[in-house]
Amino acid sequence: MSQVILDLQIASEQAQGLPEEKDFQRWLEGVLPQFQEVSEVTIRIVDEAESRDLNNTYRGKDKPTNVLSFPFEAPPEVELPLLGDLIICRQVVEREAVEQEKTVEEHWAHMVVHGSLHLLGYDHIEDSEAEEMEALETEIMQSMGYADPYLAEKDGLTE
């Protein structure tokens, strides 16, 4: 049986209204077991200031972002289930949910799925990579009972 170990850190001033730990656990379990037997992920919920600082430091972009993924890179001889860390900005997720006409829950789920796929090595820099990753995200989201997360984009509602 596969196992997903979650370390949830709330570093947001406003913890009220956030998804519960069981929600984050369920979303991770919707993604990770199909890729590896045991996975360990840290999810840190932050405010815009920390998101902006990390995004600027690691990506050279001086603005907050929805999710940052930091894969754990162990030496080849070390086998650990630790995949890495997801840093998710509460305010950006909530704002984007409104802009994309999604429920906040759907967008939180999507950010966990999206970030987890980055931890597993998926990317969306090239168009072909983006198509593969978005198709996988859509499949995973739908398997958990959510709509296609890119529906608004496909309908021309967002960029």
Curated annotation (Swiss-Prot):
Primary location group: cytoplasm
Binding-site positions, Zn(2+): H114, H118, H124
Lineage top rank: taxon: Bacteria
Lineage: Bacteria, Pseudomonadati, Pseudomonadota, Gammaproteobacteria, Enterobacterales
SUPFAM superfamilies, alphabetized: Metalloproteases ('zincins'), catalytic domain
Entry-linked Gene3D superfamilies: Metalloproteases ('zincins'), catalytic domain (3.40.390.30)
One family name in Pfam for this protein: YbeY
One of the GO biological process terms: rRNA processing
PROSITE patterns xref list: UPF0054
Stated name of the protein: Endoribonuclease YbeY
Keywords: Cytoplasm, Endonuclease, Hydrolase, Metal-binding, Nuclease, Ribosome biogenesis, rRNA processing, Zinc
Cell compartments where the protein resides: Cytoplasm
Gene Ontology molecular function terms on file: metalloendopeptidase activity; RNA endonuclease activity; zinc ion binding
Family indicated by similarity: Belongs to the endoribonuclease YbeY family.
Species name: Pectobacterium atrosepticum (strain SCRI 1043 / ATCC BAA-672) (Erwinia carotovora subsp. atroseptica)
Record's cofactor remark: Binds 1 zinc ion.
Record function comment: Single strand-specific metallo-endoribonuclease involved in late-stage 70S ribosome quality control and in maturation of the 3' terminus of the 16S rRNA.
One cellular-component annotation, GO: cytoplasm
Enzyme Commission no: 3.1.-.-
Cofactor needs: Zn(2+)
